[in-house]
């Protein structure tokens, strides 16, 4: 069950906020505090803004910033770590009151993060491998995410079969998920990896679909591939569409992460997407922003805020209506708790 978090105690009435993620510079949403206090400027430094998971995460950040009467600026690096480092430097030099970092790396951002700390700017990380005293990390339990999805794969396929892994290196959560995957293969010697690929691009789902189509042509017979394990929902979307178009829906997809778009795909007739392990991305965004406001107020914040995932199975969902993230808790008991 996911850890419950209290709301930030100081709630300020806010004006409407519009936040648009953009490349290069930042897009700003204003929410002036009704109390007359100067609105706190918050920078969200993103490695990439791809798919509906990212959109719902940003919306969660925006909601919390709006509630606290702040101004949010989103900097999107379009997967370019050097650009991400430049965006962080810009946020520090522009004297933002708080900085949120999403999926950065120590190699690219350690120096910039330390610069922010030296200037007394609160920084809160999400799924980023930087370790600096006083800089908290909000993270999903990536090992548990991988374990839940992989164990479901094993359970539904009697602990055996040929699988395709879709994964990419260079992201802190991916590296943790890989550790669990390696242990999984040792635990289930009758499950064999026959192919592995994956890359994070500006069109990840479409690029994955193209690559998965090639894999299906290489293994054309029913039974050649038992399942696909996708370490990110953008990978799962591409794999699912390729499998559907090829008419190979005997191949099941097990994945990590969830969004409204993913739910629609899971609920399609004869969808191969069988299960996914996830944390609500809107909740991640809210907690990420909530934590930086706690830091701004001088409140005590733990070094690590870990969010526990939930397994969502296709079989949990009704056949006669389309479920959204907003009403998923009606069908998956632990969702949103």
PLM-predicted stretches and their roles:
Residues 14-16, 59:
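Hydrophobic alpha-helical membrane context
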Residues 5-14:
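Sec-dependent N-terminal signal peptides
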Residues 2-4, 22-337:
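A residue-level marker of the well-folded mature domains of exported/periplasmic proteins
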């Amino acid at each position: 069950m996911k850890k419950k978090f209290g709301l930030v105690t100081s709630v300020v009435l806010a004006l409407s906020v519009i936040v648009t993620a953009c490349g290069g510079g930042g897009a700003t949403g204003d929410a002036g505090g009704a109390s007359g206090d100067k609105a706190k400027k918050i920078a969200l430094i993103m490695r990439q803004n791809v798919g509906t998971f990212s959109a719902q995460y940003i919306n969660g950040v925006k909601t919390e910033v709006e509630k606290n009467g702040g101004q949010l600026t989103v900097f999107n690096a379009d997967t370019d770590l050097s650009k991400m480092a430049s965006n962080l430097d810009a946020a520090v030099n522009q004297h933002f009151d708080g900085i949120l970092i999403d999926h950065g790396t120590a190699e690219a951002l350690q120096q910039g993060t330390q610069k922010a700390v030296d200037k007394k700017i609160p920084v809160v990380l999400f799924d980023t491998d930087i370790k600096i005293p006083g800089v908290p990390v909000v993270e999903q339990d990536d090992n548990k995410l991988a374990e839940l999805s992989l164990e479901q794969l094993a359970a539904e396929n009697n602990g055996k079969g040929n699988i395709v892994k879709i994964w990419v290196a260079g992201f802190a959560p991916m590296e943790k998920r890989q550790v669990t995957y390696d242990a999984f293969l040792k635990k289930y010697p009758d499950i064999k990896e026959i192919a592995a690929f994956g890359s994070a691009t500006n069109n990840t789902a479409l690029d994955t679909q193209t690559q998965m189509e090639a894999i299906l042509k290489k293994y054309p017979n029913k039974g050649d591939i038992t399942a696909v394990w996708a370490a990110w929902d953008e990978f799962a979307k591409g794999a699912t569409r390729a499998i559907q178009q090829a008419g190979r829906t005997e191949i099941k997809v097990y994945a990590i992460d969830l969004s409204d778009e993913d739910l629609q795909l899971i609920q399609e007739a004869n969808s191969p997407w069988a299960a996914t392990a996830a944390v609500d991305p809107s909740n991640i965004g809210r907690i990420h922003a909530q934590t930086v406001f706690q830091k701004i107020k001088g409140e005590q914040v733990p070094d690590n805020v870990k969010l526990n995932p939930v397994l969502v199975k296709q079989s949990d969902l009704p056949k006669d209506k389309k479920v959204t993230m907003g009403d998923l808790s009606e069908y998956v008991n632990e969702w949103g708790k």
